[in-house]
Amino acid sequence: MTDTALRAEALGKRFGRRRGGWALRECGFRLPTGRVCALVGPNGAGKSTLLALAAGLLPPTEGRLTVLGTSPAEARPRVGFVAQDKPLYPQLTVAETLLMGAGLNPGRWEADVAERIVAGGDLDPKARVRTLSGGQRTRVALALALGKRPELLLMDEPMADLDPLARHELMGTLMAEAAQYGTTIVMSSHVVAELEDSCDHLLLVGGGRIRLAGEIDDLRAAHRRVSGAAGTAGLDGHTVVESRTTGRQLTALIRPAGPLTGDWRASVPSLEELVLAHLRNPQAPALTTAPAVAEESAA
């Protein structure tokens, strides 16, 4: 067994030979097992590339990525992947799609799990995939992924085509399955609000590099949102991620190096405040609170 779901060391992926063709560069992080991880970043940040590498669909250009203690290719039977475009066979019915999932995952398939997820959306098992809405296709894709009882579930923008009610219901199903079976989940999104209430770990990607990595509570605790009168002294020696002055008021997100001096009002930032401040300032130093390299416990 391993206590690490994903571990990247100097990981990079380049497409083509152009100078600016790097989708990911010098990425290092560790994701422990049993976490629900938000993979966040703007469009084009490298989120989909990182998930494709973890799913074994792309080889890295440089560095190393281990999945569940082994290579992505060897870990593939233990990994579920829901791609952004939900690639399903349009000519198959819902029932035939689940039968295909059973045939592709001998010894691992949990038919009752897959059927329960499909039934939760009131889908007709005889309906052909090509007749389904985007949200219904998402539910079928999730049924396929969870039906194989994965140890690691990777999802690329899984809720993008769902209405708010369907998103809430499907997220509840997903969290219940994760809690019951201890599945590690990585969900990508560029909308932090979708993930804030469900995730306990964060990977923030910007410009193809890891900007923040670690437990969300630890990352929030390492920062302070401070406000005070413009011109107030006392931030020297602290890492200022972002500062803004509006009229006579200065607001900043900092990483304190010790006690604050001066007349500052300080609070722990929300996840959204933390993420947005780092994305608005690409020059802010990266922070990883979980060790990039950890001892693996062999079975």
Where on the chain are the PLM-derived regions?
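Catalytic Walker B motif of ABC-type/P-loop ATPase nucleotide-binding domains
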Residues: 153-157, 162
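The feature captures the beta-strand-to-loop junction immediately N-terminal to the Walker
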Residues: 40-42
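Conserved ABC transporter NBD signature motif
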Residues: 62-75
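ABC transporter nucleotide-binding domain
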Residues: 168-254
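ABC-family P-loop ATPase nucleotide-binding domains
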Residues: 85-140
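Helix-to-loop junction immediately C-terminal to a conserved catalytic motif
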Residues: 55
